[in-house]
Amino acid sequence: MRLRRKSTLKRLAIIGLDCAEPSLLFERFASDLPTFTRLREQGVWGKLESVIPAITVPAWSCMMSGQDPGALGIYGFRNRFDYSYDRLITADGDAVTVPRLWDILSQHGKTSIVLNVPGTYPPRPLRGKMMSCFLTPDANAAYTYPPSLQVDLQAQFGDYPFDARDFRTPAKDRLLQQITTMTRTHFEVARYLAARNDWDFFVSVEIGLDRIHHAFWRYMDNTHRHYESNSPYADVIFEYYRLLDAEIASLLNVIGDDSAIMIVSDHGGQKMDGGICLNEWLIAEGYLTLAPPYSETPTKLQALNVDWTATKAWGEGGYYGRLFLNISGREPQGTVVPEHASALLNEISAKLSSLGNENGQPIQTRCFRPETLYPVANGIPPDLLIYFGNLAWRSIGTVGWNQIHLLENDTGPDDANHAQHGVLIFNFPGLQPHSEPLPGAHLLQIAPTVVDFFGLDIPETMRYPVLSAK
């Protein structure tokens, strides 16, 4: 059964929660989250598999377009600009060249309100209103369409907090206050715009949950290697989920009962056990060669003297690992013959997959080739995408540690990494409730489901089917 609306139902609202974790939302905290639980019990729900890589950028743009990272040519926050060794660019909204849901709906006369969706700075024209995302530099930037909306919001709410800046900080009290205030403001603005505008499609994404997970996971998880018992922050994540539950309830009161409601996340969250120093490992294995002088302190690879004539591969840090081959005829000083590239990637993948933790115990690292993930890989994809410990370990790109395993993050305190599955709740009047979770739902099914909800033809670029339930 396709999850289609009644003919009398005209509107759909998506509430996005960056990094919402199903084991917390559906299990551990569920009995204390009446709004989430009601929507779940009266609708369909389940885990939502993310794209690879399961990263905020590009996952939200993938969800809103129904196209994978290869089609977008976006493989993370920073992507190679060209085949030089050091030019990386941030993938903001200008990097997204495919139509997203509000673009498609605008073409069919539908009005959208788009708030805080990652990948929307700078904002673009649409039929409706848009406020850009956490990539907005500050409140002095042009962050709305139409521009007059910014004047209105500035008068009503003052400077808008797009993100909790510097969330990798030991100043936990300040950060918690910042995230809480930001989230309340986000929902206050969402209610204001939802109530004062006619719309067909509404989407708002809250980034605060991701920041809370990264900053406070160790205090609630007694399996975390840095768990602190009896911490004053033990209930911070729980209380934040309760805050979201209450704020969503207030937003739903404004939206009303005549709309379909979808709650989604771009990925889940899990404890982070540490980091794998990818470039240190490549040096130790003979794939990456540095020329003197050597760094005695952790340093970005781009700032070091790499002997590219003796280097076969290098990597980038982040929540997942990205490895690039130094291919002859592609990179300026390439050393790997193109015909040998596949065998070399197989060799490196096998070694990385067998790499254990600091005690040699298996961690289940997974390596992916872009040609096996995506029908088309636009832009410059990594030659290898690496999930260290299935994302329980992050990738460390800096060099100078003289070790492979780090038990802390190299860019500041960080307790959590992403997980491959986020959450999905879909609820609208007339929908038959499902007590069991919807199996096999994928992030790339969201866009075609929304297009289908409005009775429009699904674009051929959306390869995944509409969500369905038995």
Predicted features and spans:
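C-terminal beta-strand edge segments of enzyme domains
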Residues: Q420-G422, L456-K470
